[in-house]
């Protein structure tokens, strides 16, 4: 929790003094916050906490005109993947998604750009799922 949730809480607390109406906060959660994962219980728990923090903060800051949203990536290729998994798991990474592949970082980035833009001026408390078609509730 120290890394994944406390850091967001304290960073947000420090940044709020400098934010004006029209500002946007975008947090990163994960598909595991919605699906769970028996091997990543600690990680899934922190990502679920980020989701709840995002929604609660959005309701808290709406009257100040500050939007708060999240992005929940699914399996995305990063240097962490080959460093964390054995070769067999790396070869199959993302293949269980409806699109049958893992995403690339450049496929996630536009979600952040959208949420930061004025095109999302009426969007707050929401989470965009960039996960190759895995439909999750919540």
Show which residues each predicted segment covers.
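Catalytic Tyr-X3-Lys loop
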Residues: 1-9, 26, 50, 99
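Alpha-helical segment proximal to the catalytic Tyr-Lys
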Residues: 17-18, 59-63, 121
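Residue(s) in the substrate-gating loop at a strand-loop-helix junction
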Residues: 30
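Short, flexible catalytic-loop segment of classical short-chain dehydrogenase/reductase
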Residues: 34, 51, 72-83
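Short C-terminal tail/terminal secondary-structure segment
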Residues: 35, 112-113, 124-138
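Active-site loop immediately N-terminal to the catalytic Tyr-X3-Lys motif
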Residues: 35-41, 63-64, 100, 118
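A conserved structural motif in NAD(P)-dependent oxidoreductases
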Residues: 97-108
């Amino acid at each position: 929790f120290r890394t994944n949730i406390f850091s967001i809480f304290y960073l947000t607390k420090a940044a709020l003094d400098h934010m004006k109406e029209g500002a946007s906060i975008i947090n990163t959660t994960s598909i595991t916050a919605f699906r769970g994962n028996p091997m990543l219980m600690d990680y899934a728990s922190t990502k679920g906490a980020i989701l709840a923090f995002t929604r609660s903060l959005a309701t808290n800051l709406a009257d100040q005109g500050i939007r708060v949203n999240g992005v929940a990536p699914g399996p995305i290729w990063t240097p962490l993947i080959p460093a964390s998994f054995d070769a067999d798991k790396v070869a199959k990474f993302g293949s269980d998604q409806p699109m049958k592949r893992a995403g690339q970082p450049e496929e996630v980035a536009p979600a952040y750009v959208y949420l930061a833009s004025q095109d999302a001026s009426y969007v707050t408390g929401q989470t965009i799922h960039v996960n190759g078609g895995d439909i999750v509730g919540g």
